[in-house]
Structures are given as structure tokens and as C-alpha cells.
Amino acid sequence: MRESAAQYLRPGEPIQAVIGAQTASQWLAALTGFFVFLGLNRYRILAVTPTRIVVLDAGKTSMKTARGLVTELPRSTRLGPGTGMWHQVPAGSETLRVHRRFFKDLDAADSSVVAA
């Protein structure tokens, strides 16, 4: 994710954290089926830099490769602390759901805001 996100950053802009997220609730897959979930869900990559948070589209099937810019958030935006199995993060007009495996990255991103 880090390598594919780098092409959407400014030259020399370092990445502090990379976080995977999705737009649809995980309950949608359980209640309607996997194929409906794939039709409605989009994966996102949050690339956190010292000056901004870049939200990138990663497509419908994987969060591995960034495919385009969705929005930018101010660096002062708090992403965590993560709670539960899936933590919700408001990102522009979307609510992104971040799985607990990325909670350490949420904490790292938020701690670098405090340090700055």
C-alpha cells in the first residue's frame, strides 16, 4: 500500500503511516451476501504525511493498490483511538471503517500530530 500511495504525494513528501479502510459496513456482507457487498463497498488507503492525510481509492476487491485520489483531510484530523472490531473515521462525505489490525497505525498517526 505504501508504494502505491507514494505516487499521489508531493515530491519528497514522507509517509508517516498507511492505513487500510473500507466504505461499507462489514455487516452488509453478512446480511446481504458477499457479491452485494463487493458491489457497494470501496476500499480506501489513508496515507498520513506531516502536512495532510490523503484518502485514496483502492477499488472494489483489494486495498493493495491505490487507483486515484478521493479527498484530502487536514493533518490536524484525529483518526483514533480505535475502538471495537471496526473503528469509524469520517473522511469528507464518507465514513470509513478501519479494522482493528490497523489500530496501531491509527495510534502512530495521531501521536505524530501531538509531537508536531
Residue ranges of model-derived segments:
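Anionic N-terminal interaction surfaces
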Residues: 1-44
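Aromatic-residue detector
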Residues: 13-14, 18-20, 58-61, 86-89, ...
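Phosphoinositide-binding peripheral membrane targeting modules
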Residues: 27-84, 90, 95
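Canonical phosphoinositide-binding patch of PH/PH-like domains
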Residues: 86-111
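Short intrinsically disordered terminal tails
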Residues: 115-116
